[in-house]
Regions:
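Low-complexity, glycine/alanine/valine/leucine- and proline-rich hydrophobic stretches
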Residues: 390-470
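Short, surface-exposed beta-strand/loop micro-motifs that present aromatic residues
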Residues: 49, 161-167, 427-435
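Soluble acyl-CoA-dependent acyltransferase catalytic core bearing the H(X)4D motif
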Residues: 13, 23, 34-38, 52-89, ...
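Detector for long, low-complexity, acidic/polar
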Residues: 42-46
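Positively charged, low-complexity intrinsically disordered regions
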Residues: 15-19, 239, 420
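Cytosolic, low-complexity regulatory segments enriched in Ser/Pro/Gly with interspersed Lys/Arg
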Residues: 1-40, 75
Length: 470
């Protein structure tokens, strides 16, 4: 199907890709159940609370492949279909059921209707246009489909829960993936990406038809619920639309800041040295980097000393809650919040600011998380971007430097860069990735109001820790 041109990006084709085959039996590791009716996956509180935010949109910039056009697209669609064989719920559709008692439930139907695969071209865009500046060009947002779509929209409009757009550039290719956040979190997102790239990389060598031989762990598709949790969860709303809040999208710009492994070690050592002699837990590398950002952003926003500010950070539940297996595909994350005034953050230093973030994460032990899940069933609350990004005083960080981004070699070279799409972009959104040199390096994709972002780039203390683009 022919598409149109959008910001120099022209859609060439758009189709649904279904899982390669239907495996014969269920084993909890990605095979279809041997029955004719449509399998239904009920969503957990961790899934449902994210129903009113945008899809996850992240992608990788790859070198120019040895083939192009239809040959490239057909090969990628073939490996994509094989990856969907393991992650077959990603080819399904979200649905909701409004009940006569004033409640609604949401679930994932494993219908095999397919995931969207878009082929696009942007011959006027070069790799250097994306990576040679601190500022991210706006064209990057055009490298994704299903832009600015909320999770609930997939149920009300029967949209795919997963989409991929392959955009051929002048001297490279960008693979942008979009996943409904109620279907999976960042761990699940990169698990699928890693699986797909590994399947494609050898051209099938060493991987059998049933996909044995993969080094990437097999996905575990069965959802995890508390023993006391009702399934399905009936939320006290007459319609799914009553849960949804669409946030006002203000004008923002993005910069991509990379911190070398040496710079990260220096920030971590400084933060821990400043807190030496106090009864505090060791501050992590990520907490030190985020504290460095928080302090600089308060300066860039020109916040008065008495102004309250907060930082919301994603806290992973895998490894914190017993019973969640390795390879779990679903959401297993919550938001922790650190709060202080701008004056405190400036005066008390990097170590104290990092300690606030450390305490926000440490407050989520297993007992706390279980209590939160039990309470959610009785009193559901939802994540809204308008709450996470508050009037130019807040920051929110998602993703993780532990995600394997630069291991996604599709067979013609490792990624040159990683960039995300328009999803959930608001003033104060900072997305963290592993750095391109790996080995402890990190990158922050920071989205802010243009004037404040310009002041951040001009902040000498902040930029001294940043590696400038070549």
């Amino acid at each position: 199907m022919e598409g149109g041109t959008d910001g120099g990006v022209q859609v060439v084709s758009r189709r649904m890709v279904r899982p390669f085959t239907s495996p014969p039996m269920a084993n909890g590791n990605g095979c279809h159940p041997a029955k004719e009716e449509v399998e239904v996956i009920h969503l957990t509180p961790w899934d449902l609370r994210l129903i009113s935010i945008d899809y996850i949109q992240k992608g990788i910039l790859l070198p120019k492949p040895p083939v192009s056009g239809v040959s490239l697209v057909k090969a990628l669609q073939s490996s994509f279909a094989r990856a969907l064989r393991l992650f077959y719920p990603f080819a399904g559709r979200l649905a909701s059921e409004e009940r006569g008692d004033g409640t609604v439930s949401v679930f994932l139907r494993c219908t095999d209707e397919g995931a969207e695969f878009v082929h696009a071209v942007a011959p006027g865009v070069a790799v250097a246009d994306i990576v040679s500046s601190l500022y991210t060009p706006s064209v990057v947002w055009k490298f994704y489909s299903l832009a600015l779509v909320l999770g609930a929209d997939a149920a009300t409009e029967s949209l795919p829960v997963l989409a991929v757009q392959v955009t051929e550039l002048a001297d490279g290719v960008f693979v942008g993936m979009t996943l409904n956040h109620s279907v999976g979190d960042g761990t699940a997102f990169w698990h699928f990406f890693n699986t797909w790239s590994e399947i494609h990389r050898p051209g099938g060598v060493g991987i059998t038809d049933d996909l044995r031989g993969l080094s990437t762990p097999l996905p575990v598709l069965q959802r995890w619920f508390l023993e006391t949790c009702p399934v399905p969860i009936l939320m006290p709303f007459r319609k799914l639309e009553h849960i949804v809040r669409r946030f006002e999208r203000t004008t923002v710009q993005e910069c991509f800041f990379t911190f070398s492994a040496a710079s990260v070690r220096k920030l971590k050592a400084r933060a821990n040295d400043e807190m030496a002699g106090t009864a505090t837990a060791a501050i992590s590398s990520l907490q030190a980097v985020l504290a460095h950002l928080w302090r600089a952003v308060c300066r860039a926003r020109c916040l008065p000393p008495e102004q309250g500010t907060f930082y919301s950070v994603v806290v992973g539940c895998r490894g914190r809650v017993n019973g969640i297996p390795p390879g779990y595909v679903g959401n297993a994350m919550v938001f922790g919040k650190a709060e202080a005034t701008a004056g405190e953050i400036e005066e008390k230093g990097l170590g104290w600011t990092a300690w606030l973030l450390n305490r926000a994460v440490a407050s989520f032990d297993e007992a706390t998380m279980r209590q939160s899940l039990e309470r959610w069933v009785r009193e559901p609350d939802f994540t809204y971007m308008s709450n996470l990004s508050s009037a130019g005083t807040a920051l929110v960080t998602g993703s993780s430097p532990r995600f394997d981004v630069f291991g996604n070699d599709f067979g013609w070279g490792k990624p040159v860069a990683v960039r995300s799409g328009a999803g959930n972009k608001a003033d104060g959104k900072a997305t963290v990735f592993e750095g391109p040199e790996r080995g402890g390096s990190m990158s922050l994709e920071v989205c802010m109001a243009p004037d404040a972002l310009a002041r951040l780039v001009a902040d000498e203390e902040f930029m001294n820790a940043v590696s400038l683009p070549a």
